Amino acid sequence: MVVAVYPGTFDPLTRGHEDLVRRASSIFDTLVVGVADSRAKKPFFSLEERLKIANEVLGHYPNVKVMGFKGLLKDFVRTNNARVIVRGLRAVSDFEYEFQMAGMNRYLLPDVETMFMTPSDQYQFISGTIVREIAQLGGDVSKFVFPSVEKWLTEKVAAMGGPAA
């Protein structure tokens, strides 16, 4: 049984993320979506909110588990007995960072492979950062996120005082 981990902050989870989950879950016996508690990135949504969002969007996949984690990815991978780390590459600009991370992960976890996947064409330009910015400025994000995620974004922006002018 091959277990893979797809780590990320998923802040918020986009249609691009779901596209990779759908495709990766058809390759591996179990796909663990690891929602990182990355304080360095100063997330828009709390870890608890991101876990709820991910479960709402991904809960219908029978072989996908959504779990939060803190600390090193290597420890999360080991805890889940994963043999593969799945990473998404949207553009060439993502490659340099992801290549360095894959090298470090190989050093820390020599028996674990990193698999890069590119999103489907219609999702290659989507990033959580861009989606958050559009939402905070009052723009339409419905083509980039699922309706439940759009609702979370709308409520969060409203709680912060509404869209910036």
From Swiss-Prot:
Query: Where found in the cell?
Result: Cytoplasm
CDD domains referenced in this protein's UniProt entry, alphabetically: PPAT (cd02163)
**By its UniProt entry, which Pfam families does this protein fall under?**
CTP_transf_like
EC number in record: 2.7.7.3
Q: According to its UniProt record, which cofactors does this protein need? A: Mg(2+)
What processes does the entry annotate via GO biological process terms? coenzyme A biosynthetic process
A single GO molecular function term of this UniProt record: ATP binding
Q: Which reactions appear under catalytic activity for this entry?
A: (R)-4'-phosphopantetheine + ATP + H(+) = 3'-dephospho-CoA + diphosphate
Keywords, A to Z, come to: ATP-binding, Coenzyme A biosynthesis, Cytoplasm, Magnesium, Nucleotide-binding, Nucleotidyltransferase, Transferase
Binding locations of substrate: 9, 41, 73, 87
Entry's Gene Ontology cellular component terms: cytoplasm
The pathway to which it is assigned is: Cofactor biosynthesis; coenzyme A biosynthesis; CoA from (R)-pantothenate: step 4/5
- Keyword ATP-binding in record: yes
Subcellular location, principal: cytoplasm
Binding locations of ATP: 9-10, 17, 88-90, 98, 123-129
Classification via InterPro entries: Cyt_trans-like (IPR004821), PPAT (IPR001980), Rossmann-like_a/b/a_fold (IPR014729)
Q: Site (Transition state stabilizer): give the residues.
A: 17
Quaternary state and interactors: Homohexamer.
Function of the molecule: Reversibly transfers an adenylyl group from ATP to 4'-phosphopantetheine, yielding dephospho-CoA (dPCoA) and pyrophosphate.
Q: Which family does it belong to?
A: Belongs to the bacterial CoaD family.
Name it: Phosphopantetheine adenylyltransferase
Give the source lineage, highest ranks first. Answer: Bacteria, Pseudomonadati, Pseudomonadota, Betaproteobacteria, Burkholderiales
Question: What's the encoding gene here?
Answer: coaD
